[in-house]
Amino acid sequence: DSEFAELKIRGKIFQLPILKASIGEDVIDISRVSAEVNCFTYDPGFMSTASCKSTITYIDGDKGILRHRGYNIKDLAEKSDFLEVAYLLIYGELPSIEQYNNFTKQVAHHSLVNERLHYLFQTFCSSSHPMAIMLAAIGSLSAFYPDLLNFKEADYELTAIRMIAKIPTIAAMSYKYSIGQPFVYPDNSLDFTENFLHMMFATPCTKYKVNPIIKNALNKIFILHADHEQNASTSTVRIAGSSGANAFACISTGIASLWGPAHGGANEAVINMLKEIGSSENIPKYIAKAKDKSDPFRLMGFGHRVYKNYDPRASVLKETCKEVLKELGQLENNPLLQIAIELEAIALKDEYFIERKLYPNVDFYSGIIYKAMGIPSQMFTVLFAIARTVGWMAQWKEMHEDPGQKISRPR
């Protein structure tokens, strides 16, 4: 039986359908409110508004649950590789061995970018931020695939594969250009994560031997960042896509949104904060500063718009961080890790943080891992974009396959 919520306004009662969720909260359908009541709803930041139907990702922030297509994020991080999760997000099911092999071969086949793209890179000054370079490069792909500007249903999957394949190549090119080194071509004998590390750190005169611990850690980081419901950048991709814009342009808008310090740049802010704290002895002073509303200092890496419990991704990254630093001989003498662990322990026992449900989030440990790997801070958000492109493309594909989706037009 259908359920309804009642809205009473100006002496009249209107019935609003309640849509049943397969899991999580039900939703009140307000799509007819403006026509029937002559009023709009007001929800800054979309705090209580669902803009679409989706079966890709589920989050229960109160319980600290994150699932992709029904699979727990911790299980995926421990037992899958990134392209397996990419297949899951795009197609809805984990691949068979044959499907996985075919998918990875297609991604490898499309990893090379057009040589003319090199000329675009040369137009940037050497001090350009890698995100600025990547933003322009991804958007420029529209010019190289004019046949895909008007999409048919059969093109969605090929476009997703192309985007997933080319973004690590372009990301590594952005880094190489920013440090004045020659580009390194992808090596299709390597898997996705190995290939990215190869393109980042190899040079024409020096081969890069991939450390399996580093590869495994980066694989987990990519999985943990692959999708996260209708966040700012994903919503931006969907809004752009609702107009019929091509996928390359849509992903460019997602990258632009992700670049914002409140979204994708938080792990770099955590590193800067830990450096500012300087030593464990200073933690109480900075805890006090964080509580002081008149003090501009903020405790970065704590709290989340959705999670009111421990971010499940953060617990995986905490252990991954220890594994990486142990492998690199930094576990006992890495000052940033020591400060982070003690800061977390103190904050989790403090009533101020407990009452406000401020727990470590995914950004708290990821920057420490990147730094230990030798990845510079200006590349942190670039790596986030590599991972999140999988989610963006899955959401973009789902949006186009939804017959009820309309062009986005907030009032």
From Swiss-Prot:
Q: For this protein, what is the EC number? A: 2.3.3.16
Q: Which residues catalyse the reaction? A: 304, 363
Q: Which reaction does it catalyse?
A: oxaloacetate + acetyl-CoA + H2O = citrate + CoA + H(+)
Q: Does the keyword Acetylation apply?
A: no
Q: Which residues cross the membrane?
A: none
Q: What is the lineage of its organism?
A: Bacteria, Pseudomonadati, Pseudomonadota, Alphaproteobacteria, Rickettsiales
Q: What additional remark is attached to this entry? A: Citrate synthase is found in nearly all cells capable of oxidative metabolism.
Q: Answer yes or no on keyword Transferase.
A: yes
Q: In which pathway does it act?
A: Carbohydrate metabolism; tricarboxylic acid cycle; isocitrate from oxaloacetate: step 1/2
Instruction: Identify the GO cellular component terms for this protein.
Output: cytoplasm
Q: Where is the signal peptide?
A: none
MF (Gene Ontology): citrate (Si)-synthase activity
Q: Which protein are we looking at?
A: Citrate synthase
Single GO biological process annotation from the record: tricarboxylic acid cycle
Q: Which domain of life is it from?
A: Bacteria
